[in-house]
Amino acid sequence: MNPPRGDAEARHTVILDAALQVFGQYGYRRTSMDDIAREAGIGKGTIYLSFASKEEVFQALAQRLAQRMLAGAEAARHRPGTTADKLAAMHAAWFGTYADTISRSPHAAELLDAKHRLSAGLVTDAGRRYQRLVRDVLAEAAATGELDLDTAGLTADTAAELMIASARGLESIAASSAAYRRHLDTLVRVMIAGLSRRLPAGPVPPGWHETA
């Protein structure tokens, strides 16, 4: 007899919460199902009711993290505010959440490593989906005339690629996840300001003098 759906989902959550702690502390290779069971406060056999192997636990946890980041970015996309506000909130949900996760656990980066054999596919797919979200926001802003991508020689796709690549690069200079979040916000606002459609220049303000 299968357990009630609510019980199965609750067990699934408890196992993945525990797995995040032990994978983050010891890394995938050093973590055992016994470690996960001990952290979860359940028997190892109970884990096998939800997952066939440690590999499945790892993949499910990576998928949960990626889905939460995407859900946060999707919600931010529809928030009130300017294009810069939306994209800054989206970057906070995607890159900021990732930075917060790895800052708390020495090995947590494995879970969202696009080169890890167990999570590469789903991480790559999630990254593409996030890039499409960013692209769509930029395309909408260009369509309304808020942004001028043409003058910069960009499409919405290439602008999204540039914004995301720049955000990744900022991680190497940030001293903390909080600093990274601040850098992300600044990056978005600087890029959007640079792409914003400008009105034709008006008369020179009184008292202004051009300097060489």
Model-based region annotation:
Residues 1-2, 89, 96, 100, ...:
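C-terminal peripheral helix-coil segments that are non-catalytic and often amphipathic
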Residues 1-26, 30-42, 55-59, 78:
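Basic, helix-initiating cap at the start of DNA-binding domains
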Residues 8, 58, 62, 66, ...:
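Amphipathic, non-transmembrane alpha-helical scaffold segments
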Residues 8, 83, 152-160, 180, ...:
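Short amphipathic alpha-helix in the helical subdomain of ABC transporter nucleotide-binding domains
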Residues 24, 48-52, 60, 64:
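Base-recognition residues in the alpha-helical recognition helix of bacterial helix-turn-helix
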Residues 45:
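Key DNA-contact positions within bacterial/archaeal DNA-binding proteins
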Residues 60, 74-103, 156, 160:
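Hydrophobic alpha-helical connector segments
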Residues 89-136, 146-153, 172:
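Short secondary-structure transition hinges
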